[in-house]
């Protein structure tokens, strides 16, 4: 596998330099049941968000993160903040999937590579070398799960430049249209 910094298509990716999970506040301006709000949309807006600061200084946010994954990411980050060399032990002897992956493979990097527009979900790829296999493989994963594995393995995380640019354009367009504001 290529050098950590020099993987194929590195120029098409921005490295994540800082990361923080944001948890929703239980108070909101929408009623819990509203005829204008689709229940699946309501479910998504009450889920955590991962906010990533990228190497170019921009911010990339990814919503709809499962609560348990966001909490596990937060625990890994908090443990590292206290002591970078502290093992990420848990009182529970059972392994989570993210822990099992790093036990069975050398994780090189996680990359958020694409979006599936009809579902409005991102796709990630996890580059790793399974123990005893020697040959690199790439797994497509749910991005939040790939990020968790990368954090546990101290591997780098990247986001596709095209995804970041599309998100910026969408944000600019929403500002122009005063998205979310009501006329008074």
Specify the residue positions occupied by each region the protein language model found.
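Divalent-cation
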Residues: 2-184
């Amino acid at each position: 596998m290529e050098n950590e910094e020099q993987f194929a298509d590195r120029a098409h990716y921005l490295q994540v330099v800082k990361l923080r999970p944001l948890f929703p506040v239980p108070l909101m301006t929408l009623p819990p049941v509203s005829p204008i709000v689709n229940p699946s949309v309501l479910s998504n807006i009450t889920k955590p968000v991962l906010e990533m600061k990228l190497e170019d200084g921009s911010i990339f946010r990814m919503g709809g993160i499962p609560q348990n994954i966001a909490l596990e990411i937060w625990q890994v980050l908090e443990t590292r903040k206290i002591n970078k060399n502290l093992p990420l032990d848990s009182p529970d002897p059972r392994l989570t999937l993210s822990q099992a992956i790093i036990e069975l493979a050398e994780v090189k990097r996680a990359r958020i590579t694409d979006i599936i527009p009809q579902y409005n979900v991102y796709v990630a790829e996890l580059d790793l070398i399974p123990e005893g296999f020697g040959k690199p493989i790439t797994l497509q994963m749910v991005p939040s799960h790939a990020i968790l594995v990368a954090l546990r393995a101290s591997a780098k995380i990247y986001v596709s430049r095209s995804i970041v640019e599309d998100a910026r354009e969408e944000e600019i367009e929403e500002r122009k249209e005063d998205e979310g504001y009501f006329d008074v």
